[in-house]
Amino acid sequence: ACIELPGITVIAGLNGTGKSTIAKSVFAAVNARKNMAGKIRKDQRQSIENELEEWLEQNNDFDDIMLFFEAHEELAQHILEAYESEKWEKGDIYGKTENIIEEYCANNNLDNSDIEAPVKEIVSILNRNLDEYVQFFVEQYYQNVFKNQINPIGTGRTAFVDYKKVDAEREIASSVSIQKNRLSIIGKILTLQQENAIYIETHSVLDFCQDLGRRSNRAGRMTLPTRELLSNLMTERELTFTQQQEQERNQKIVHDIAENITHGHLQKNKNGTIEFWDEGVNGKIEFSNMSAGLKIFTVLQQLIGNYSLKRGDVLIVDEPEVNLHPTWQIALAEILVRIYKELGIYVLANSHSPYFIRAIEVKMAEYECALQGRYYFMKQDENAYISTDVTENTNEIYDALYQPLNLL
C-alpha cells in the first residue's frame, strides 16, 4: 500500500482486505519513536537498579527494611544524576560510578565486596549505543501493535513500512523492514518526533473504563492503541501559554459536539477512572447504558477538549460507521472534516460504508478543502489486496459497496 495523508484520507474496501493493517502500520510508523529519550532513560534506570539490587542483596543482611527497599533505587538515582549533570566522558564512567557506590555504602554501613561486577555492568549500560536502543524500542512498538504477527501469515516475503513527512521547512523520512517478524531500521536512525497518532479502533474504549474500576481481567487484554487511547482520555495536561491558547480555540468543536450530540461530557470520578455525565438528567450514566453510537462522539469530544489531539497529529478511526445510523454517519463525517480544517489534525479513516464515505466527500467540498482529500480502494491482486488511488473516480468505491444491495 502507498497512502498519502494531505488532510483526510479514506481507505475503503470489503471486510478482510487489509484496511486495518494499513491503519496499524501508519499508527506504528508515527508513534514508534515517540518519547524515545524518556524510554531510554527509563530503561537505563531499571537496568541499573536491577544490577544494584541483586549485588546488594548478595552482599548484605539488611536490618533496616526501608534501606532494603530503597538502596538500589537511591544509588541508581545518584549515578544517573551525576552522569547527566556532569556529562561524564566514557573513560570516566567506571571510576565515578565506583566512587558513588563506595561512598553510599560507607554512609549506610553496607558491604561493598565484589564491587567490580556491578560497576562493569553499569558502565556497559551507560555506554550502550543509541542506535541499539532505538532499534529495540521501535521493534518492540511494532511487535506490540501487531501482537507479534507483523508479517502476513504463511508468507516469507519481507515487509516494508516507509514513513515520510513533508512540510514547508523540512522533510522527515524513516523506513523499516520486517522479515520473519523481526524488524530492521533502514538508513538514518531518527529519534526526534513531535507529532502523535491516536487510533480509535472499532470497539469502544469506554467499555474498558468500567472494567478498570472493577479490576476486570478484560482490561489486561486491551490492544496497545486502545491502552494509549484510554491514557489520553484520562490525562490532565499542564499546558504552556501557547498550548493553552490553541486549546481554547479548539473549544468551539467541543462545545458543538456536546450541544448537538452528546449532551454531556467525560469526567474523572473519585476512583480516578472516568465516567459520563449527562447534562440532561444531571447525573452519571454507566457506559454500558450509553448508546453505542454516542461513544465515538464522546471520545472525540474528550480528546480535543483535553488537548490530547493537537495541530499536526494524526487521528486514525477504524470503521467509525459501526453502530451509527446514516444520519449520525453524516454528523461524524462533518466533525472529522472540521477537525482537519479548523484544528489542523490529519485524519485517516477506514470504512466500508458508502454513506460515510460520501459524507466525507461532500463535507470536504462544503468546507472548501476537497483538494486535501484522498480516497483509496482495496483491490485484489493475485494473492493479496493492494490500495488503489481512486480520488479522481470515487464511483469505483460506491459501485463496489452498493453491489450487495443490487443482488437483492
Feature-to-residue mapping (PLM):
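Phosphate-coordinating catalytic segments in nucleotide- and nucleic-acid-processing enzymes
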Residues: 32-305, 310-312, 385-408
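Switch/communication elements of ASCE P-loop NTPase nucleotide-binding domains
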Residues: 1-39, 275-406
